[in-house]
Amino acid sequence: MEKTIGLEIIEVVEQAAIASARLMGKGEKNEADRVAVEAMRVRMNQVEMLGRIVIGEGERDEAPMLYIGEEVGIYRDADKRAGVPAGKLVEIDIAVDPCEGTNLCAYGQPGSMAVLAISEKGGLFAAPDFYMKKLAAPPAAKGKVDINKSATENLKILSECLDRAIDELVVVVMDRPRHKELIQEIRQAGARVRLISDGDVSAAISCGFAGTNTHALMGIGAAPEGVISAAAMRCLGGHFQGQLIYDPEVVKTGLIGESRESNIARLQEMGITDPDRVYDANELASGQEVLFAACGITPGLLMEGVRFFKGGARTQSLVISSQSRTARFVDTVHMFDDVKTVSLR
């Protein structure tokens, strides 16, 4: 899969990022998301595959494009599919977030990016549009920290695994009222907290790379983004755990479903019989081969944002593979017109 469509999925996230970046700082988050979705879908439909969106922009009746269950790729066309020799059709599941951190893009803040994860059919967990308690940590702490332990306990373990004093550790937490006690506990334990307004996929992935000064992600965020983060962390060999949150009282904000009971019923309809189960990266991204791709929209810890010049743009992308165990940073100059001078800055 990496050899057949690896480069093309980079182009998919690049096109989404360029489209969103044109609206960076204009305060139009919905429009930034819409153009990213459209650009991603157009390029995705040029890839020689039969893809199925398992995590996208919502249910079919809620989203016009990249909705859950939508087929994408050249072979979504039954006539073209019929001409493919037996056993040669590439069927994949796809999780997308065309503009991760729409507010970050809209207000020109760092950390917005276009992301997707792919695996063979059945290889990605079809997470409901609920919330998820998450714990991400570097590879050295894999299997040692645990989402069921307190933040204080996990910080002690992290300190030992990384051979760092606790006061040298940085934990990323989303700036939400629900995290007030978590933030207090982390600070009382001696670690430092980096609060983010949006974009916890970037924060989770940063835990997998040395030199980002990000040592853990803790707290509750969106479940679909949790699956995308898990796919990346599986490829990187990092630690990721997620637990679905179905009680509105826990997140102190709206959820699909009006009550704890209705949310449990919805999970059961989806075949999730144990709503309190803790999933690791291998369960959320269980496929034999998993690929993750991202392209910076605004500058972040890992990638530069889109930089426009007269007649073109420059992007920085990341593609991570579970099969080759590689993380490739791709620097691309896009020439829109007949450009006489190509900017390398």
From Swiss-Prot:
Inhibited by AMP and slightly innibited by hydrogen peroxyde. Its EC number is 3.1.3.11, 3.1.3.37. InterPro entries: FBPase_class-2/SBPase. GO terms for molecular function: fructose 1,6-bisphosphate 1-phosphatase activity; metal ion binding; sedoheptulose-bisphosphatase activity. It comes from the Bacteria. The keyword Transport does not apply. Mn(2+) 2 binds at residues 97, 100, 225. Disulfide bonds: none annotated. Homotetramer. This is D-fructose 1,6-bisphosphatase class 2/sedoheptulose 1,7-bisphosphatase. It comes from Synechococcus elongatus (strain ATCC 33912 / PCC 7942 / FACHB-805).
